[in-house]
Amino acid sequence: MYIERFPKIEDKIEAGKVLVIYGARQVGKSSLVKNYIEKLKLNRSNEKQAFFNGEDVNVQAIFSSMNLKTLNEAVGDVSLVIIDEAQVVRNIGISLKLLVDTKPELKIIVTGSSSFELSGQIGEPLVGRMNIINLFPLWEKEVKDASLYDYITDLDFALRFGRYPAVFKEPVVEKKKEIVTNIVNGYLLRDILAFDRLKNSKLILDILKLLAYQIGNEVSIHEIATKLSIN
């Protein structure tokens, strides 16, 4: 079951600009893009598409090259380019600028799990050349439109487990816990630790736990530092 997300890609995408989709891992970026492509197929659009995975070393070599000939050979005659996990590609901003400036008819979608890394790379080169979608876990309007929505039950689950799409769609509580644990350990902490080369994963986890206990209250940095014996 696909849950309709807002804003929609079709409302933000335009030729001659890069559509940047920011969002944490597992929040639904890939599903949003796939749903957009499915809509194009249903509407019998003749747009030719090229999909690139930024974690592929060959893709990294192409889009970090800043070489217009290399970029044009990779893109070919397509009208829609999609680059997933673009934050791991060095010089991605400059390469995208070259494509936008030389192919004004081209539509480009890039997704990034690390807003810090991706915005740092594309911010200056793509000024005036990009639109942005910030994708978060499911929010009230999106959930209310889903067929299995029950306000009281969902509120309880939302407060306990959050609203990552995979968690929301899983009916079994124990499996919800497992999915949340996997997201925290497999993705969230990995991305946090990768930012600015942080290494102390236990300390980060302890800070997150203390922040969770203070939800709804004013956060005291001094109190957190005292409890964890850090400065």
Question: What are these model-derived regions, one by one?
Answer:
Residues 32:
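Hydrophobic positions on the alpha1 helix immediately C-terminal to the Walker A/P-loop
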Residues 116-132, 147-148:
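Short regulatory helix/loop adjacent to the ATP-binding pocket of P-loop NTPases
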Residues 93-116, 124-125:
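Conserved catalytic/switch belt of AAA+ P-loop NTPases
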Residues 21:
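Hydrophobic anchor at the beta1->P-loop junction of P-loop NTPases
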Residues 48-80:
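Short glycine-rich substrate-engagement loop in P-loop NTPases that contacts/grips substrate
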Residues 136-231:
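Interdomain hinge/linker elements that couple catalytic modules in large macromolecular machines
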Residues 29:
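Conserved lysine of the Walker
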Residues 1-13:
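Pre-Walker A adenine-sensing motif
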